């Protein structure tokens, strides 16, 4: 009767890893553009999230996708779901 497939309703965001100094944790910077309500200019807003990285595979500069999850610790409620693009080494 009810053969529908469950879809994940968890939020996903894509951002850049700015710190991986903690064990099994990375800091991800998410940037988005918002139109200023009065002046109409597009302004870049940013926010940092702590995300759980179980295998310690992410490095600084990597582009990753994070997914909302249950709280892992006091400041972590996101987990790294996949690596979108590795950082380029110059």
From Swiss-Prot:
Keywords: Ribonucleoprotein, Ribosomal protein, RNA-binding, rRNA-binding. One of its GO terms (biological process) is translation. CDD domains: Ribosomal_uS17. GO terms for molecular function: rRNA binding; structural constituent of ribosome. One of its GO terms (cellular component) is cytosolic small ribosomal subunit. Pfam families: Ribosomal_S17. One of the primary rRNA binding proteins, it binds specifically to the 5'-end of 16S ribosomal RNA. PANTHER family: 40S RIBOSOMAL PROTEIN S11 FAMILY MEMBER (PTHR10744), SMALL RIBOSOMAL SUBUNIT PROTEIN US17M (PTHR10744:SF1). Part of the 30S ribosomal subunit. Belongs to the universal ribosomal protein uS17 family. This is Small ribosomal subunit protein uS17.
């Amino acid at each position: 009767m009810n053969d529908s497939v469950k879809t994940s309703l968890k939020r996903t965001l894509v951002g850049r890893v700015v710190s991986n100094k903690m064990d099994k944790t990375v800091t991800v910077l998410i940037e988005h553009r918002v139109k200023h309500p009065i002046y109409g200019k597009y302004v870049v807003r940013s926010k940092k999230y702590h995300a759980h990285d179980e295998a310690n595979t992410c490095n600084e500069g990597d582009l990753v996708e994070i997914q909302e999850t249950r709280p892992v610790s006091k400041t972590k409620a996101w987990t790294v779901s996949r690596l979108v693009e590795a950082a380029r080494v110059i």
